[in-house]
């Protein structure tokens, strides 16, 4: 416990909240260029080949972002838009690539949750 004199000299430091997505720099989305597109394996007990991309952002950061949905058209030098949101079973992946914007195509033949995957209304 500090004395009253110590508290007068230096007041208590309020703890600052640490951001979960520092590369966005308080923006909802950021644009970037893919430097590498590859697959990664998740932590135990899950097993899969998750599609991820290494992205160099306009904010100067280089981050790993997850590519959601079935199938994608991304390759090196593709321009993408990323948002926050981690993937629980992939360590170090704290961002998602937004489908249906810039060079990223939406998911084909998607009927449910279309807005999350950049899919247009299906033709009847």
UniProtKB/Swiss-Prot annotation:
Record PROSITE patterns: RIBOSOMAL_S12
Family: Belongs to the universal ribosomal protein uS12 family.
InterPro entries: NA-bd_OB-fold, Ribosomal_uS12, Ribosomal_uS12_bac
A GO BP annotation: translation
Keywords per UniProt: Methylation, Ribonucleoprotein, Ribosomal protein, RNA-binding, rRNA-binding, tRNA-binding
Pfam families membership: Ribosom_S12_S23
KW Methyltransferase (keyword) present: no
Name of the protein described by the UniProt record: Small ribosomal subunit protein uS12
Modified residues (3-methylthioaspartic acid): 89
Subunit structure: Part of the 30S ribosomal subunit. Contacts proteins S8 and S17. May interact with IF1 in the 30S initiation complex.
A GO MF term: rRNA binding
Reported function: With S4 and S5 plays an important role in translational accuracy.
Location of the region described as Disordered in the Swiss-Prot/TrEMBL record: 1-28, 104-124
A GO cellular component entry from the record: small ribosomal subunit
């Amino acid at each position: 416990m500090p004395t009253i004199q110590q508290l007068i000299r230096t007041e208590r430091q309020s703890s600052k909240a640490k951001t979960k997505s520092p590369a966005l720099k308080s923006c909802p989305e950021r644009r970037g260029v893919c430097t590498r597109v590859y697959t990664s394996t998740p932590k135990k007990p899950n097993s899969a080949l998750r599609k991820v991309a290494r992205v160099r952002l306009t904010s100067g950061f280089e981050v790993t972002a997850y590519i959601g949905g079935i199938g994608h058209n991304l390759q090196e030098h593709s321009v993408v838009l990323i948002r926050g949101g981690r993937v629980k079973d992939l360590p170090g992946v704290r961002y998602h690539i937004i489908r249906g914007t810039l060079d990223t195509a939406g998911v084909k033949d998607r009927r449910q949750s279309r807005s999350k995957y950049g899919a247009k209304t299906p033709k009847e």
